[in-house]
């Protein structure tokens, strides 16, 4: 029986599928799998199930001389050297559609949390308490009637747009390509990035990461935004220059931010932790039972297809 190496614990539903077709070796240590352990694990493996936090570089790929597939448990895949994997004739797959609803839900949740100061209010209620209702106390912003600007109208961005429309928000979007059919379906308007930044009350990043997207939102972009704007990032941390974000918040160039991902993840810039107008969550975009189970099944089926000589779903290289 061929071996699959699983770089961390995954939901039981996918693990059971793998056990029906493979000898399964899974990393069960504390924290993330280290490079030496990963290299040892893939040496005699036909398939690797990597996590979004698993760094699959050239050394790891070279060690996996029998690898046919690297099935990444996550929608992103910038943790894998996909070009080198292609050179070695190794398929790399991801789990794109499983994350759509969960990440869109979280994105809108972050919009509401930062605009209505929900987390800040929770902390106040648990610590010092409050004196009671008052007309000027703890005011935030409504989302109804506001404009949301979505960077990246893919599956997740489109799901965010549909939810935003349910809140009676106007929807702007930007990206490398205009999507006229989705515009008609959702009621969204395509604009360039600068126009979006200047006009949106809430800016959500829902685009995939690539090197061209690095620091897409930097000092210059923050200066374009409304002073009452909010930035929400549930995509990839390096799209936003975190130090520039800190300065924009401290200088009141924007009103607030909500982040589920970080430039130096898992580390979080200390200044962000000290600001009351920032909501921080620990990369939980697709952390629902439903999404994680679906992702588990997708990576398992991809690995099974590859060793059976079939083309797996969601190949990215």
UniProtKB/Swiss-Prot annotation:
NAD(+) binds at residues 155-156, 234-236, 260, 283-286. The keyword RNA-binding does not apply. Pfam families: 2-Hacid_dh (PF00389), 2-Hacid_dh_C (PF02826). Keywords: NAD, Oxidoreductase. Gene3D superfamilies: NAD(P)-binding Rossmann-like Domain (3.40.50.720). The keyword Chaperone does not apply. It is an enzyme of class 1 (oxidoreductase). InterPro entries: D-2-hydroxyacid_DH, D-isomer_2_OHA_DH_cat_dom, D-isomer_DH_NAD-bd, NAD(P)-bd_dom_sf. The active site is at 236, 265, 283 (proton donor). GO terms for molecular function: NAD binding; oxidoreductase activity, acting on the CH-OH group of donors, NAD or NADP as acceptor. Its EC number is 1.1.1.-. Belongs to the D-isomer specific 2-hydroxyacid dehydrogenase family. This is Putative 2-hydroxyacid dehydrogenase SAR2389. It comes from Staphylococcus aureus (strain MRSA252).
